[in-house]
Design a protein with these regions (language model features):
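Conserved PLP-enzyme active-site core in the AAT-like
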Residues: 1-201
Length: 201
């Protein structure tokens, strides 16, 4: 509940071993093997978990790299819309390991809605900026799900977390977390994360 409070979400999942696993849980909750996703390329910091060598590829997703706006180190909105209209992805992802500017979440959310896709924002490296309100909350801008690592800019224990306002996605992630991908609840890590969240209040 503290994670949900800090990130202004209706649902939060903390039974997540890492940020990479947060992405996998989210991919599994939205997609099935063979579905198409559009992801930020590595040239603008797109994370390996969104690509073929990472969990998106291991899960069997069809991965297409988004066109880039090299001046702002993010996706090119006009070209992304053309690509999404052509490919009809199940999921579009945004965010990454290197972030010079805030990403155009609202514009990408509009594209996702237009083509019937969901939008995942990977906040592994920005979640502290979001918790501290230095950057806008992706959920407020139209992201369906936000994934994160809890030990980078958030300053918590090793692990991951997922926040969403979508009850359907939250229910699927709950079942993926247990009994799907984890078999125990790490009380010590959860307590450490709770203390971290209290620091952000």
């Amino acid at each position: 509940s503290l994670v949900a409070e800090i990130f202004c979400s209706k649902f939060a999942e903390i039974r997540v071993p890492s940020g990479a696993m947060a992405n996998l849980f989210s991919f599994m909750s939205i997609c099935k093997p063979g579905d198409t996703i559009i992801v930020p390329p590595a040239t603008i910091g797109g994370h390996v978990t969104h690509h073929s060598p990472g969990c998106a590829g291991l899960f069997g997703l069809n991965i297409i790299e988004a066109p880039i706006d090299k001046d702002y180190y993010t996706v090119d909105i006009d070209q992304l819309r053309e690509l999404a209209l052509k490919e009809k992805p199940k999921l579009i992802t945004l965010g990454g390991s290197l972030n010079l500017f805030e990403h155009p979440i609202s514009a990408v959310s509009s594209i996702a809605k237009e083509v019937g896709a969901r939008l995942l924002f990977d906040a592994a490296h920005q979640c502290g900026l979001i918790a501290g309100k230095a950057w806008e909350n992706p959920l407020d801008l139209g992201a369906d799900v936000v994934t994160m690592s809890t030990y980078k800019s958030l300053g918590g224990p090793p692990g991951g977390a997922i926040v969403t306002n979508d009850a359907g996605i939250a229910k699927k992630i709950d079942r993926i977390a247990f009994p799907g991908m984890t078999a125990n609840f790490d009380a010590a890590k959860s307590a450490a994360l709770a203390v971290t969240m209290l620091d952000w209040k």
